[in-house]
Design a protein with these regions (language model features):
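Conserved catalytic alpha/beta core of Sir2/sirtuin-type deacylases, generalized to analogous enzyme cores
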Residues: 1-154
Length: 154
């Protein structure tokens, strides 16, 4: 699940992605909701198209799918977010209530509560470290002292 509207996840190889704020490289028909990849020639169309993104005050795209993923997750990681905007601000709480281990990864400490672990440092280093820990040990223990990052339990 991503809140980003760019295509960086897709370019990095993510294939099972839910873009809850839409995708900038897609357009949506205002009346029918049809979504097309952009660029798409709509010059001859008499109908109105708009970017396939969520604007303030609009309902999040695919929220039902997001909730299914949150309640089925064994690990929930929030990476590079303030965690202050609803509904994403409740995702860690929802995942944790469903039994997931929750991890916050941010460049600076946020003071967020509700996470089992808070990793402080660059996501480019900490996400691979987290994935490696889960794959090699089957659990999340602590951050690597070799990189100078540490995992702090709430």
């Amino acid at each position: 699940v991503t809140q980003n509207i760019d295509d960086l996840h897709q370019r990095a190889g993510s294939t099972r992605l839910t873009a809850m704020h839409g995708e900038l490289k897609k357009i949506r028909h205002v009346e029918t909701g049809e979504v097309l990849d952009w660029p798409y020639d709509v010059k001859e169309s008499e109908t109105v198209w708009r970017p396939h993104v969520v604007w303030f005050g609009e309902r999040t795209i695919g929220l039902d799918v997001v909730m299914e993923k949150l309640t089925a997750a064994s690990v929930f990681a929030a990476v590079g977010t303030s965690g202050t905007v609803y509904p994403a601000s409740r995702f860690a709480e929802i995942a944790k209530a469903a039994g997931a281990v929750t991890v916050e990864i941010n460049l600076n400490a946020t003071g967020s509560v509700g996470y089992d672990y808070a990793w402080v440092g660059p996501a480019s280093q900490l996400v691979p470290e987290l994935v490696d820990q889960i794959i090699t040990t089957g659990s999340i223990t602590s951050g690597s002292r070799q990189t100078g990052h540490r995992l702090m339990a709430d």
